[in-house]
């Protein structure tokens, strides 16, 4: 893990959609995965206020590992217990590229839920979205986010999720996650194995 910043963890949570919303599948075709996103609540002085994100947060002294950080934060933010799912492993650690953002190192964990319990968002979460992975991999999801600061424009790659754009560090995590799926599958259902770090 890179050094020089505080540590944090997020959970990229996948599920097979419930039968009521899953597209029809043949006898040998599994329904495609959906990926969970949250829209963070508007909080003054929070650099990620109102952003689209994965559930997660900063590592606390009582957390035995970053996997436990992801578990605790997801439970606090959404009432979702990741121990009810299967941890595939961790993606590469990431840090913000902007010098204006806090120095923090984020480890993303990939979890597949074997059921779809209802989400109970806390005050930190304004909205939740389950987005089909197949759509995220299609051209219709590709977008550009424009940031205007001091009379200048910066253009960032982004993904459309509902009426919102996923950009910044979450976009970088998502791009890394999507590379795990077999590019030849028309409906991505089987991500490749990841380095495993067990949940507590």
Model features per residue range: what roles?
Residues 1-54, 58-117, 134, 147-200:
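N-terminal leader/linker segments that precede catalytic domains of diphosphate-processing enzymes
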Residues 24, 119-123, 140:
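Short, charged, solvent-exposed linker or helix-capping segments at domain edges/interfaces
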Residues 118-135:
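Acidic, glycine-rich loop-and-strand cores that form catalytic or ligand-binding grooves
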Residues 135-144:
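A mid-sequence, solvent-exposed acidic-amphipathic segment
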């Amino acid at each position: 893990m890179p050094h020089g910043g505080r540590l944090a963890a997020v959970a990229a949570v996948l599920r097979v959609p419930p039968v009521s919303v899953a597209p029809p599948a043949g006898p040998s075709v599994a329904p495609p995965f959906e990926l969970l996103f949250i829209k963070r609540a508007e909080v003054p002085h929070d650099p990620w206020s109102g952003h689209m994100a994965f559930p997660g947060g900063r590592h606390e002294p009582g957390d035995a590992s970053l996997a436990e950080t992801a578990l605790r934060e997801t439970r606090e933010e959404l009432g979702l217990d990741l121990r009810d799912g299967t941890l595939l492993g961790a993606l590469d650690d990431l840090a913000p590229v902007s010098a204006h953002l806090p120095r923090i190192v984020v480890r993303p964990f990939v979890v597949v839920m074997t059921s779809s319990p209802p989400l109970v968002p806390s005050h930190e979460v304004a909205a939740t979205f389950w987005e089909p992975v197949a759509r995220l991999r299609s051209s219709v999801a590709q977008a550009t986010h424009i940031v205007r600061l001091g009379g200048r424009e910066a253009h960032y790659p982004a993904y459309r999720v509902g009426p919102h754009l996923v950009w910044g560090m979450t976009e970088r995590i998502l791009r890394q996650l999507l590379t795990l799926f077999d590019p030849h599958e028309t409906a991505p259902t089987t991500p490749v194995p990841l380095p495993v770090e067990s949940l507590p």
